[in-house]
Amino acid sequence: MAPKAEKKPASKAPAEKKPAAKKTASTDGAKKRTKARKETYSSYIYKVLKQTHPDTGISQKAMSIMNSFVNDIFERIATEASKLAAYNKKSTISAREIQTAVRLILPGELAKHAVSEGTRAVTKYSSASS
């Protein structure tokens, strides 16, 4: 009978290998993969916050909530404007459809302020581009 192998003290299990990082330049000519960019309104929300309350900060969680809010309102207005364009047998959403959608979605005084600010922004854009 063969002698038993010596027992070694238990050591840490070998660490699991992490998947290899994306190659920057490979020899087979494959293109480098870039990280998918996440588009948010964070920078714009931050600029507006600093205009209204210069000494106030915002947490990452609050910024995430604000970003979700802006995306939600944008989607609601776009959907309503799309329906309005379809009702009028038009294939293009114009400023008029957006304005009507805002009036339908936002309540009372908030809609009035949004429409006046939107009109001001469109006027400013039109005068700057021409």
Swiss-Prot record:
Which CDD domains did the record assign? Answer: HFD_H2B
The species this protein was found in:
Candida albicans (strain SC5314 / ATCC MYA-2876) (Yeast)
Region of interest called Disordered, as start-end residue ranges on this chain: 1-38
Question: What lineage, starting at the top, does this entry show?
Answer: Eukaryota, Fungi, Dikarya, Ascomycota, Saccharomycotina
List the GO molecular function terms. DNA binding; protein heterodimerization activity; structural constituent of chromatin
Instruction: Check the record and name the SMART domains matching this protein.
Output: H2B
Gene Ontology cellular component list: nucleosome; nucleus
* Name of the protein this chain belongs to: Histone H2B.1
First-listed, main subcellular location of the protein, grouped into a coarse class: nucleus
PANTHER family listed in its UniProt record: HISTONE H2B (PTHR23428)
List residues modified as Phosphoserine.
Answer: 11
Q: Belongs to which family?
A: Belongs to the histone H2B family.
Keyword Phosphoprotein assigned to the entry: answer is: yes
Look up the domain of life of the source: Eukaryota
Glycyl lysine isopeptide (Lys-Gly) (interchain with G-Cter in SUMO) crosslink, residue number(s):
7-8, 17-18
Q: How does it assemble?
A: The nucleosome is a histone octamer containing two molecules each of H2A, H2B, H3 and H4 assembled in one H3-H4 heterotetramer and two H2A-H2B heterodimers. The octamer wraps approximately 147 bp of DNA.
Q: How is it modified after translation?
A: Monoubiquitinated by the UBC2-BRE1 complex to form H2BK123ub1. H2BK123ub1 gives a specific tag for epigenetic transcriptional activation and is also prerequisite for H3K4me and H3K79me formation. H2BK123ub1 also modulates the formation of double-strand breaks during meiosis and is a prerequisite for DNA-damage checkpoint activation. Phosphorylated by STE20 to form H2BS10ph during progression through meiotic prophase. May be correlated with chromosome condensation.
Report biased composition (Basic and acidic residues) as residue ranges: 1-19
Q: Where in the cell is it found?
A: Nucleus; Chromosome
- Glycyl lysine isopeptide (Lys-Gly) (interchain with G-Cter in ubiquitin) crosslink site(s): 124
Q: What does this protein do?
A: Core component of nucleosome. Nucleosomes wrap and compact DNA into chromatin, limiting DNA accessibility to the cellular machineries which require DNA as a template. Histones thereby play a central role in transcription regulation, DNA repair, DNA replication and chromosomal stability. DNA accessibility is regulated via a complex set of post-translational modifications of histones, also called histone code, and nucleosome remodeling.
In the UniProt record, does the keyword NAD occur?
Answer: no
N6-acetyllysine found at: 7-8, 12, 17
Record's Pfam families?
Histone
SUPFAM superfamilies hit by this protein: Histone-fold
Question: Which keywords label this protein?
Answer: Acetylation, Chromosome, DNA-binding, Isopeptide bond, Nucleosome core, Nucleus, Phosphoprotein, Ubl conjugation
